[in-house]
Amino acid sequence: MIVGISGSPRRKATEFVLGEALKMLEERGFETKFFTVRGKKISPCQHCDYCLKHKECRIKDDMFELYEMLKDAKGIVMATPVYNGGVSAQIKAVMDRCRALVAADYDFFRGKVGMAIAVGGDRIGGQELAIQQILTFYILNGVIPVSGGSFGANIGATFWSRDTLEGVKEDEEGFRSLRKTVKRFAEMLEKMEGV
């Protein structure tokens, strides 16, 4: 099962692109689940170390819904809008709060496969920096990061929204990078299942 996580507090561009990625994966035979931060209460990590002692997060909010989804996930597709040249505060909170999962089980994420999507209002608005933040999260936690590879989707799927849903839908280069990244992500998942 693959969990798609939308890190946008708004409904349009990032959610749309993530939905398209999940459809592509479903067409390849994968089961997917969708999680959005929109409308959810996900507080930032307090780094209080409660999770180190008690093996769970002390902050009881909507993050527990995602914790449950991630338990069965073989793959993670994390999508973020670009805010100030990086990830959204909401997806950063999600990544930081996953500390509790690793505190409870150091190998929680080990062997899962991850890809990243970033949607920016400008063509060169920080998409690659946002993706690097997500890939760093993956690496630190034992998730196998997958990119689209050389020649056009180097570290993940990048979109230029022009701050509209219509802009995303018209971004042919963005969809090319998405198709390449989804293809390599699916191939890695298939290889991992065959191991």
Swiss-Prot record:
Keywords: 4Fe-4S, Flavoprotein, FMN, Iron, Iron-sulfur, Metal-binding. Coiled coil: none annotated. Binds 1 FMN per subunit. Binds 1 [4Fe-4S] cluster. One of its GO terms (molecular function) is oxidoreductase activity. The keyword Metal-binding applies. Its cofactor is FMN; [4Fe-4S] cluster. [4Fe-4S] cluster binds at residues 45, 48, 51, 57. Gene3D superfamilies: 3.40.50.360. Homodimer. PANTHER family: IRON-SULFUR FLAVOPROTEIN MJ0731, NAD(P)H-DEPENDENT FMN-CONTAINING OXIDOREDUCTASE YWQN-RELATED. Belongs to the SsuE family. Isf subfamily. Redox-active protein probably involved in electron transport. This is Iron-sulfur flavoprotein AF_1519. The lineage of its organism: Archaea, Methanobacteriati, Methanobacteriota, Archaeoglobi, Archaeoglobales.
